[in-house]
Amino acid sequence: VHENFKKDSAALGASLMRSGMAQAGATYCHGPTRLPLLRKNPRGHAEFLRQFCEHSAQGSGLTSIGYQGRRPSLYKLQTEIAHIAVPTFIMVGDADEPCLDPSLMLKRTIPHSQLAVLPDSGHGINLEEPELFNRLLGDFLATHG
């Protein structure tokens, strides 16, 4: 799985630098993990796309290639992650397919962790469900902050 992520990160980075942010945004910002935001909040999605397109194509491309694609897999860091001693709150959208399994792994690995799976939500849960996101986070911080 991580090898595919590396390849995808390299391809995205090359595409960003070759075609620019507007072209990349037309596909990346309309991918399956971003569609719930478009459906729930078209104006919010348009703003997300606008801000995405304002980023530097070279900077975003190099970040995708040089950082995203090269960072170690969370699965390879499980031993270190298991030593996290502070309460940890993990949130994920149920339509954010690439993040579901890693989120569950984090929940199982971090001793004092909680996992919230937001229904009918993608990768932008704070933009898609701001009230629910803020309430859940606020409750966690009130208990553990």
What are these regions (language model features)?
Residues 112-145:
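Catalytic active-site module of serine/aspartate enzymes centered on a nucleophile-bearing elbow/loop
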Residues 97-102:
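Conserved alpha/beta-hydrolase "acid-adjacent" motif
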Residues 81-85, 108-110:
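Short, conserved loop/helix-junction motifs that constitute active-site signature segments
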Residues 83-84, 90-92:
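Short beta-strand/loop motif that positions the catalytic acidic residue
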Residues 1-28:
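Flexible "cap/lid" loop of the alpha/beta hydrolase fold
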Residues 46-77:
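Hydrophobic, aromatic-rich cap/lid helix
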Residues 78, 104-105:
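Active-site phosphate/pyrophosphate- and oxyanion-stabilizing loops and adjacent acidic/basic residues
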